[in-house]
């Protein structure tokens, strides 16, 4: 069975188009993840972080959904699906937590963000 050069060319173009389309879909889905994290830490050393149930209660009472609440060292990390949820939670927690806690947005260095930063930085080195 002999395959004509025209058929091979069409097959190779089709495979290249399929690979490019797959790569574009993969990049697009990676960019759509906009996870956001709030970090709550005490101002003074030795003070404890707020109770996770207390945080859950106040966020739930205000209709703010979150992915997880995790204590890590002397910090309480709250993960959200979007930065809008994180900003709304910061407003609620600023009102409801007693003084003595720092509530800050924490940058999530996901693999996607790291690779995009590398690609952006390397493009400026050419030329």
Curated annotation (Swiss-Prot):
InterPro entries according to UniProt: Modulator_MzrA, SecD-TM
Gene Ontology terms: cellular component: plasma membrane
Keyword Membrane: yes
Membrane topology note: Single-pass membrane protein
Subcellular localization: Cell inner membrane
Main location: membrane
Keyword annotations of the record: Cell inner membrane, Cell membrane, Membrane, Transmembrane, Transmembrane helix
Residue ranges that the UniProt entry lists as topological domain Cytoplasmic: 1-10
A Gene Ontology molecular function term of the record: protein kinase binding
Transmembrane segments: 11-31
Periplasmic side: 32-127
Superkingdom classification of source: Bacteria
HAMAP family: Modulator_MzrA
Protein role: Modulates the activity of the EnvZ/OmpR two-component regulatory system, probably by directly modulating EnvZ enzymatic activity and increasing stability of phosphorylated OmpR.
Complexes and interactors: Interacts with EnvZ.
Family: Belongs to the MzrA family.
Protein known as: Modulator protein MzrA
Natural source organism: Enterobacter sp. (strain 638)
